[in-house]
Amino acid sequence: CSCDIPCSCNFGRPERTCHGSRLIQIREGQFEGDSLAGINFVVTFYMGRWTRIYIDDALGDTEIVTLDRLMPVAFGGFARLAQVQVRVPLTVSETSDTFRFSVPESTVEMKLFPGLDGSPITITGLPSRSYHDYVQYESVVHTHRSGEADWSYSGTNGFKSEMRVSG
């Protein structure tokens, strides 16, 4: 996102304008009897004002229908503010210390933000079920260009985490 490291929003205390792009990769789970495994999408946002949802165009029709039903339940904030929800090419790549994802209007590349001994910085106990196994990264590239906004950041907050829900 556009925030300093670490982002105060992740601690439940947003302090200023936050522009961001978040990759959501659902690896396992079910919703109303349908599998969620393999559903991927990117949400680019201007926090509290708007979102743009980019759905992986590799998803099949069944996955799209399931995601459409899931979106207002599990990702209601993103869905309510969505200016656009569109299927697009989505690329993801990862090495031992970098992570990159891209859709036509938004690109994020991050590198691990090392601790004192060079190992990854992990944070536990954050106030959201979206932040399990939180690992701190730093943006190398964070760009977005659309009719709604144009930004480019580097050296700002980045992270990877796991969302765990049931019910």
Outline where the language-model segments fall:
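Short, exposed beta-strand/loop patches in secreted or surface proteins that constitute
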Residues: 88-94
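Generic structural motif
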Residues: 6-8, 27-29, 46, 58, ...
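Broad gene-expression machinery/nucleic-acid interaction feature
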Residues: 19-21, 50, 98
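Short, hydrophobic/proline-enriched secondary-structure or compact coil segments at domain edges
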Residues: 53, 96-106
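N-terminal ordered "arm"
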Residues: 1-29
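Extended, charged low-complexity segments
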Residues: 115-167
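Structured domain cores in non-transmembrane regions
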Residues: 26-84
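Short amphipathic beta-strand/extended segments with alternating polar/hydrophobic composition
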Residues: 33-40, 107-117
